[in-house]
Amino acid sequence: MNKNVKPNNPMKVITGPDTRWSYANVWEPKSINGGTPKYSVSLIIPKSDTKTLTKIQAAIEAAYKEGEAKLKGNGKSVPPLTAIKTPLRDGDTERPDDPAYAGCYFVNANATSAPGIVDVDRNPILTRSEVYSGVYGRASITFYAFNSSGNRGIACGLNNLQKVRDGEPLGGKASAEADFATDEDDDFLD
């Protein structure tokens, strides 16, 4: 048996290379509202990447089927998939004022353990400045059902990341390289 062949997990997806990373908290876990600190990234997927979007839809459906008992909870029946929270969201309707999300869907993925981060040649990336909100890359993500404090749905876990290429940094902050790209001395006292 080939050791490199892994059993197929229908809830796991590897996104396409045109996926853009936003809100990339992949080096240090962050706590939201006093919750468990987590590593996270918003994965912006072009609507034209139908291959990735089809895989995500199938993985969400697989997570729904696998998690029916959890989703049912104390109720008598499982709520329909259309009635629960799912992680694939439309950037045009949910983030209409953010041009980075225009013409895209997005998925927020998180994990309590750090994701592995590699470059296009699968070498580990250790320099933090190489991974920022705005880069393009593939993401290994897994979908799962949850039922917590009355909230039921499908969530997305973050496994690993592969940076494919640089992109315009998101967040409106210029890089130090861009700020100091000119040799001119702009003396504000002149």
Residue positions per predicted region:
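OB-fold ssDNA-binding interfaces and closely related basic DNA-contact patches used
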Residues: M1-F106
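Structured, beta-strand-rich domain cores
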Residues: A69-G150
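Residues in well-ordered beta-strands of folded domains
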Residues: S42-I44, N108-N110, Q162-V164
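Compact mixed alphabeta submodule
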Residues: V118, R122-D190
